[in-house]
Structure formats: structure tokens, C-alpha cells
Curated annotation (Swiss-Prot):
It catalyses: Endonucleolytic cleavage at a junction such as a reciprocal single-stranded crossover between two homologous DNA duplexes (Holliday junction). Its EC number is 3.1.21.10. This is Holliday junction resolvase RecU. GO terms for biological process: chromosome segregation; DNA recombination; DNA repair. The lineage of its organism: Bacteria, Bacillati, Bacillota, Bacilli, Lactobacillales.
């Protein structure tokens, strides 16, 4: 049988028996969702939080054409601390964002000693510090306070990963929304500040 483009196929389609799919934020990376959330917070006058640039030292550049430069060799100037920082209602905010496809744990190799030390320094200065953890296969996002990450890091130094059970016990689930997409300020206000704002 010939199926012309303007004709409907005479074959009947079998209904799909697969699970319903969640197409919310499809194709958008976790980092882009956080950036969109931060843009929303800024536009609404709620917070000023930005992604920190990674300092890079450019060593060699090729010029294949006069108008085009191509960086061929570059190095990180220093180890990066955390991904985001800013101010919310007079409080200093500093956080790291991690995404994993794993279903039951987040790899601890994603957290480096200098990042843990940086988080300890933020907490010592009464700053608000945490990690946003996104399990992409389950579409679950959690805010884990830095002191719970630090405690796990020091207690279980040999562990290869932090179990999802630990994150669910000590962290706070963040339900994705439209505006903002990852409403983490709600968790900060309710759980880390006890409902108080300055």
C-alpha cells in the first residue's frame, strides 16, 4: 500500500502501553533551570543570585581566519568553589548544583575538598549554604543544607556515593514549577530561616 503525504494511513495504530510522560522542562538542563529561576527572582526583586564565572587562563589561540579566534589551550587558574552566590533579603547565599542520572545516590567524587572547605567557611560567617541536587531520571530535586553534606563527607569519607535515602531524610524536596522553575527560596525561607526574613 502506498501512503501519500496528504492521505491518512489505512493501518490502525496500536495505542501505546507505556507510562505517561512528563514533558515539563524537557530538553532544559538543570543549570539552565536554575539560571531561569535566578532571572525570575531578580526580575521580581526577590534576590540577586548569579552563577560564578570559572577563572580560566588562556595559553594559546589559533586564528584560522582573521575574524575568528579559536582557543586551543587553556587552564583553570584556580579551583572553583561553588556554582552560585548572591543575596536574599539581607542574607548571603552560596550554593552548589549537582545533577545525576543515577536513581539511588549522588556520587561523592562530585564534591571536592576545597568545595567542602569553602562551604564550612560560609557557614562560619553565618551565610546560607546548601547544595541543589537533581535526580534527572526521577525528576526529583532536593535542597540539602551544607552542614548535612559536610557531616556526611566527614563521617563517611570512604563512601563513593550519598544515598538518596540520606538526602530525603536531611534535605527538602523542591517541586518544579513554572515561575520560578526551581523555587528554592521557598525552602530557604521556610526551613533554613524558620519563616523569618529581615
Amino acid at each position: 500500500m502506498v501512503n501519500y503525504p496528504h492521505k491518512l494511513s489505512s493501518q490502525k495504530r496500536q495505542p501505546s502501553l507505556s507510562q505517561p510522560k512528563n514533558f515539563a522542562n524537557r530538553g532544559m538542563s538543570f543549570e539552565k533551570m536554575i539560571n531561569a529561576t535566578n532571572d525570575y527572582y531578580l526580575s521580581q526583586g526577590l534576590a540577586v543570585i548569579h552563577k560564578k564565572p570559572t577563572p580560566i587562563q588562556i595559553v594559546r589561540v589559533d586564528y584560522p581566519q582573521r575574524s575568528r579566534a579559536k582557543i586551543v589551550e587553556a587552564y583553570f587558574r584556580q579551583a572553583s568553589t561553588t556554582d552560585y552566590s548572591g543575596v536574599y533579603n539581607g542574607y548571603y547565599i552560596d550554593f552548589e548544583a549537582k545533577e545525576t542520572k543515577q536513581k539511588r545516590a549522588i556520587p561523592m567524587k562530585n564534591f571536592h575538598p576545597h568545595q567542602i572547605q569553602h562551604m564550612e567557611q560560609i557557614l562560619a560567617q553565618q551565610g546560607i549554604c546548601f547544595v541543589l541536587l537533581h535526580f534527572s531520571s526521577q525528576q526529583e530535586t532536593y535542597l540539602l543544607p551544607a552542614y548535612d553534606l559536610i557531616r556526611f563527607y566527614h563521617q563517611d569519607k570512604g563512601q563513593k556515593s550519598m544515598p538518596l535515602g540520606y538526602i530525603r531524610e536531611y534535605g527538602y524536596e523542591i517541586k518544579a514549577g513554572a515561575f520560578p522553575q526551581i523555587p528554592y527560596l521557598n525552602v530557604i525561607k521556610e526551613h533554613l530561616l524558620g519563616g523569618k526574613t529581615r
